[in-house]
Curated annotation (Swiss-Prot):
Region described as Disordered: spans on this chain: 134-155, 169-222
MF (Gene Ontology): damaged DNA binding; enzyme binding; single-stranded DNA binding; single-stranded telomeric DNA binding; zinc ion binding
Subcellular location: Nucleus
Highest taxon above the source species: Eukaryota
Species for this entry: Caenorhabditis briggsae
GO cellular component: DNA replication factor A complex; nucleoplasm; nucleus
Protein name in UniProt: Probable replication factor A 73 kDa subunit
Location of the DNA-binding region in this protein: 236-326
Length: 658
């Protein structure tokens, strides 16, 4: 495969601070202006395929689906540049980034989606993940500019530019070490101008700069701003205050020690630093929180946003040759940089470290201890958080933080939580704390007074809602069983995705709907029956009783297909309309009525909320569907949903050829 060579001219034309930045909103503006005259649009290719044809007299040889970070759009590439296409077709595939230098639009008739035709482009890069901003998920544009008329997003979507690595490094070096001012020229034919700066004497070293009162400048001794730290800046040196220092973590399973700390410079930018094993011990004893240091040397890598909430794209791994020197200067404590996410939006950041500004609505009076599945004794304390988004979310404190937390310091107060992690369980969302979490009571930042005003004036009249992946529930447009199967719904999420279907039970086996479970509170392990006793391997004890529990598998069918689903616990109880114990008693006392209970469930249309997830079993990937809830069909709402689907389908171009 041929490589992509980027010239200095191309780099200078399209880079933004050394990175490739997409032209967010390009699709909308091109539709409004019927092309994009005089402007190049930097977009990413999501799909690409050779396809020779003609539309409205316009010949094309290639089809691509472009994304500007906000909108996606199907686009044709003109046959007029077929020679370029043949040279670069291997690159015009998913992940490539191009600059569209010439674009024309044409319509195939009233009510038909406007077509894009690229007549000029420059190939910039390849092999990128699909780019998007955390707060915006790219979506297909309908082709109707009126829907988003005037929309000009102020959103940055960018990535590193590997093909321009050498040019980027030179650019970063020039940014951190600007060239010295040029000497004024001598006046022709005689004495130098009286404004001329005398030339330095040969072989004399430059005098060191005078000491700065508030620490060295960004260019002194090669120091660069933390914001400029990237893998392409060689021999970097930064200066800042250690704003956070964690304890050394021991990982016995890997025989490893890890030490993390964060350093913040005078601009308020922060970067995370990590050291391992002997290096971790060395730097942990050297570094003190709230003191300033110079740091040089180390490997720069992509930040893992699951454990890093500094806001920096990169983090530093310290090596044996890394140098950390005391700064000597007392720097002002950096301002709290809170990248706030509203509670109503935490579902979009599941598994990531985020910041929230909230009011504690309720809190456990005391911490509680419990034993984990691994046999460890853990301590936790839960609280309920609210904000102006009218969402209510539970947060869990762990360990010492749970024990020392004082209700009077939290309840009804504005609190900033920096570095909490949203987690999903059975469709509901909560927040968890970790070693990287900071708790700041009544922080001095913008938004505090507004949040408290909302709490005192509007909150008493607001309806608070728990955040749930299923909160859309049966109100969202239903899908079909065949549609869920064909699109492998749930494959894009480790936790699975939720969908509603209108379907009926067409097959169920009463004999396997229940099992005998452990009678201990909170345990659902299947027991082993022997000599009149019931042994639970999980609890490691035998009892003279058990409890009935649901584990139902049954076939759901609609007009498009069938699928086997599983229902447990409360979800299964909603399906049957009885508790597992009630049905179990029927099995013991009246087997005919027991069987009739399940027969009555069949061939009755219901609205089902299903959790779909892809799982691997015996090296085969399968789609597993689990019942979350079930309701009677609200015919009026169902008809309304179908009408909405019909409206959404109007004007959608058939994309099967892409």
């Amino acid at each position: 495969m041929t490589s992509i060579k980027i010239s200095s001219d191309v780099f200078n034309k399209y880079h933004t601070n050394g990175k490739l930045r997409l032209s967010t909103g390009y699709v909308q503006e091109a539709l409004e202006k019927q092309g994009y005259p005089g402007h190049d649009g930097v977009v990413q290719i999501l799909k690409g395929k050779e396809d020779i044809g003609e539309q409205m007299g316009h010949g094309f040889t290639y089809r691509i689906r472009i994304c500007d970070g906000i909108f996606q759009y199907n686009t044709l590439v003109s046959a007029d540049i077929d020679d370029q296409i043949k040279r670069e077709a291997e690159h015009l595939v998913e992940g490539a980034i191009i600059a569209i230098t010439n674009l024309s639009t044409f319509s195939q008739g009233a009510g038909i989606k406007t077509s894009f035709l690229i007549t000029g482009y420059t190939l910039l890069s390849r092999y990128h993940q699909t780019l998007s901003a955390p707060e915006v998920k790219p979506r297909s544009h309908s082709g109707n500019p009126a829907e988003h008329h005037g929309y000009r997003p102020n959103i940055v979507v960018e990535d590193v530019w590997p093909e321009a690595e050498s040019i980027t490094s030179e650019f970063q070096e020039n940014m951190s070490n600007p060239p010295a001012a040029k000497m004024p020229k001598r006046e022709s034919g005689g004495e130098a101008s009286h404004n001329r700066v005398p030339a330095p004497e040969p072989h004399r070293s430059r005098a060191p700069p005078p000491p700065a009162r508030r620490g060295p400048s960004n260019t002194e001794r090669g120091v660069i701003p933390i914001a400029m730290v990237t893998p392409y800046v060689n021999n970097f040196r930064i200066h800042g205050m250690v704003s956070r220092k964690e304890d050394i973590k021991n990982i016995p399973a890997k025989n490893m020690k890890i030490f993390n700390f964060e350093i913040t410079d005078s601009n308020g930018d922060t970067i995370r630093c990590t050291a391992f094993n002997e290096t971790a011990e060395s730097f942990h004893s050297t570094i003190t929180e709230n003191l300033s240091y110079y740091l040089s040397g180390g490997s720069v890598r992509q930040a893992n946003k699951k454990f890093n909430n500094t806001g920096h794209d990169y983090e530093i791994t310290l090596r044996n040759d890394s140098v950390v020197e005391a700064g000597g200067e007392l720097l002002a404590a950096p301002k709290l940089n809170l990248k706030r996410v509203s509670l109503a939006e935490i579902a979009g950041h599941c598994g990531e470290m985020i910041d929230v500004l909230v009011i504690v609505e309720k809190m456990d009076a005391e911490a509680t201890e419990f034993t984990s599945k691994a046999g460890k004794t853990l301590t936790k304390r839960e609280m309920e958080l609210i904000d102006e988004s009218q969402a209510l979310v539970r947060l869990t404190l762990w360990g010492d933080e749970a024990i020392k937390a004082n209700v009077d310091d939290y309840h009804g107060k504005v609190i900033a939580f920096k570095g909490v992690i949203p987690r999903e369980f059975n469709g509901g969302y909560s927040l968890g704390t970790g070693s990287g979490t900071r708790i700041i009571p009544v922080p001095e930042i913008s938004g505090v007074s507004e949040l408290y005003d909302w709490y005192t004036t509007e909150k008493p009249h607001s309806e608070l809602k728990l955040i749930s992946q299923t909160s859309g529930g049966m109100s969202e447009a239903p899908r079909t069983i065949a549609g869920l199967q064909e699109m492998q719904f749930g494959k894009d999420s480790d936790k699975g995705d939720y969908a509603s279907v209108k379907a009926m039970i067409t097959r169920i086996n009463p004999n396997s709907a229940l099992y005998k479970g452990c009678a201990s509170e909170g345990c659902q392990k299947k027991v082993i029956e022997s000599d009149g006793e019931y042994r639970c391997e999980k609890c490691n004890k035998s009892m003279n009783k058990f409890k009935w529990l649901y584990m139902m598998q049954f076939e759901l069918s609609d007009e498009t297909g069938q699928v086997y689903v599983t229902a447990f616990g409360d979800s299964a109880a909603k399906v049957v309309g009885k508790t597992a114990q009630e049905v179990g008693d029927l099995k013991d006392e009246n087997l005919n009525e027991y069987n009739a209970t399940f027969e009555r469930l069949q061939f009755v249309p219901k609205m089902w909320r299903l959790r779909c997830k892809m799982e691997t079993y015996n090296e085969e990937v399968r789609q597993k569907m689990t019942v979350f809830s079930v309701e009677e069909v609200n015919q009026d709402k169902y008809i309304e949903n179908l009408k909405e689907l019909i409206e959404q389908m109007k004007g959608i171009e058939d994309e099967g050829s892409y």
